[in-house]
Amino acid sequence: MYGDIVRIARAQIPPSVKFIVGRVADIETSPERQRVTISGGDVIDARLVVLATGQGDVLRQKLGIRRRMVFPKHTLSFGFPIHRGPGGARFPALTYYGEHPRDGIDYLTLLPLGDSLRANIFTFCDHRDRWARAFRDDPKRLLLEVMPGLAHFLPDFEVVGKVQLFMMDLSTVEDHVRDGTVLIGDAFQTSCPAAGTGVSRLLVDVDRLCKTYLPEWLATPGMGADKIARFYADPAKRAADARASRAAEFRRALTIETNLKWELRRREMYLRRRTLGWIAQRLRPLSDHGIGSVRK
């Protein structure tokens, strides 16, 4: 699925843009020109380097940019393909929310992937917990252990592939205003996968950089830190980053906190989903290929 998205995105690159595949071995920056050395020895000379390396630290460290941990091991996610089997409801997609705060499970999504379904589970479990450690070896049993109501929708499902595990730290960067280099997306600030803000944040970064700042920067000499600082101070970018941070805190608290405030918030969200689900079923029944959203 991810590979397909990448191929589609790369197909949009115009022929006038040179596309190079390689591993960056070194990077040197200055107020005027930047030099990127590929592992094979080729050198790319450019006015600006845009760093979109996700959680990778190697190039950031070469540039003297430090990562500041906000919340280590914030989210633990699992992904795997399943075959739905002959029974149960027929749906193109399903979101099933965790049943108890003690389980630490936010929600499960099921999306079509060829002849199978792609299951993604977003949790705030400790990776050392019994359930989390054992899940990769016996995913079906342990999934039904914490989501028994899922059997109503998928009574005969089978896990048909390897379970992938993803641990996400929440972090941001310091000392990042540097000559000739811009960090975007997770390279600047990571996002909670359960909150679903990573792509939207990245798109805001790209939109503001390409439409507002790059035309101005390239129209004048130099690429010093004073220019770069304007991008990081952009109000739209800062607002998107702040929304992502708040969403990460909200999803975790909504999932695992047990005090009265969050119990009431869970009930509110449950009633809202049930109401929207009822309306959706009246407009387009689930059995008629609607999209389901369930919390027991």
Q: Would you name each region that the model predicts?
A:
Residues 1-62, 68-74, 78:
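Conserved N-terminal helical subregion
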Residues 211-296:
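C-terminal helical "tail/cap" subdomain of flavin- and related membrane-associated enzymes
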Residues 21, 28, 37, 43, ...:
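Well-ordered beta-strand positions
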Residues 32-34, 115-116, 179-180:
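Beta-strand-connecting loop/turn residues
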